[in-house]
């Protein structure tokens, strides 16, 4: 069972908190109960989010560089934030809270009932057919704007906010390895790590390079509530448990596939 259903927008969640929580938290509980009652031996994989950490990553001692914010190479999270970061006492956004509720419930069903549940806390999950929008799925939406000429809006942090991006193939391959040898109630950060990450500014440059034209970009000073300034996932725990897994796609590979997909549709 691969549970990817969700309400994924921060802004939409703030407008309709009850609906958001019903979809993300209660919906997950419904699936867990159905699994426990009818096929308790099944592997249950849940796509969580890095927003379960709230805005705690924004307390990191970031350094402002020309195109991005960055950590010093000697910082313990330089190679990415791992699962030891606190999920408590921070601003998550209402979306983050509903996903965290589901995240913990999936873990608990694994530990309490002995079910084969696994939680994957995603950074930016993307791929060539990602239907990104202004509210979420930034890399896909960015390339869409690069191809169409539509205006792209940057919200805060001078466009230097950093995200890691994992290709859908690589993420599904993580799921496959977990399915073959599940660990009950386990949780993993799942993202592009140091292998595939970029700032908003760097992503714009890459999209312009691949699309072969300048983008229409507008900057707004105010960041989104609870938005991360810097997020890179440390996936060393997953690699330790599943050493045969590896990345297959770089950031440029993913962007080129997006561009090809969008120009074919056009």
Residue ranges and their predicted role:
Residues 157-158, 187-189, 201-204, 212-230:
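C-terminal "lid/loop" region of Rossmann-like NAD(P)-dependent oxidoreductases
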Residues 1-123:
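N-terminal Rossmann-like NAD(P)+-binding domain of SDR-like oxidoreductases, especially those catalyzing
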Residues 163-170, 250:
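A conserved structural motif in NAD(P)-dependent oxidoreductases
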Residues 68-86, 143-156, 181, 210-219:
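A short C-terminal helix-loop "cap" of Rossmann-like NAD(P)-dependent dehydrogenase/epimerase domains
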Residues 1, 171, 175, 190, ...:
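Non-catalytic, hydrophobic alpha-helical segments
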Residues 236-237, 249-266:
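Amphipathic terminal alpha-helices
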Residues 100, 113-116, 126-141, 150, ...:
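Glycine/proline-rich active-site loop of Rossmann-fold NAD(P)-dependent oxidoreductases
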Residues 168, 187, 223-246:
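Conserved C-terminal active-site "lid" loop/helix of NAD(P)H-dependent oxidoreductases
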């Amino acid at each position: 069972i691969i549970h990817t259903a969700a309400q994924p927008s921060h802004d939409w969640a703030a407008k309709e908190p009850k609906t958001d929580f019903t979809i993300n938290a209660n919906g997950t509980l419904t699936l867990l109960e159905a699994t426990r009652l009818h096929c308790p031996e099944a592997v249950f994989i849940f796509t969580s989010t890095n927003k379960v950490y709230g805005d705690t990553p924004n307390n990191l001692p970031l350094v402002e560089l020309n195109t991005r914010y960055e950590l010093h190479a000697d910082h313990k999270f330089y190679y990415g934030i791992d699962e030891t970061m606190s999920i408590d006492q921070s601003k998550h956004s209402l979306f983050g809270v509903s996903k965290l509720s589901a995240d913990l419930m999936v873990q608990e069903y694994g530990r309490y009932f002995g079910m084969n549940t696994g939680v994957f806390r995603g950074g930016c999950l993307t791929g060539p057919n990602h239907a990104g929008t202004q509210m979420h799925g930034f890399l896909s939406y960015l390339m869409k704007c690069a191809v169409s000429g539509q205006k792209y809006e940057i919200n805060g942090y001078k466009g230097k906010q950093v995200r890691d991006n994992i290709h859908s193939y690589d993420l599904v391959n993580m799921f496959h390895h977990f399915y073959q040898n599940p660990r009950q109630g386990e949780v993993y950060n799942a993202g592009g790590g140091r292998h595939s990450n970029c700032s908003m500014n760097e992503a714009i440059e890459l999209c312009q390079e691949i699309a072969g034209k300048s983008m229409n970009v507008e900057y707004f000073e105010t960041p989104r509530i609870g938005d991360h300034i810097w997020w890179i996932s440390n996936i060393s725990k997953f690699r330790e448990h599943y050493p045969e897994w590896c990345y297959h796609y770089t950031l440029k590979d993913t962007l080129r596939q997006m561009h090809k997909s969008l120009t074919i549709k056009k």
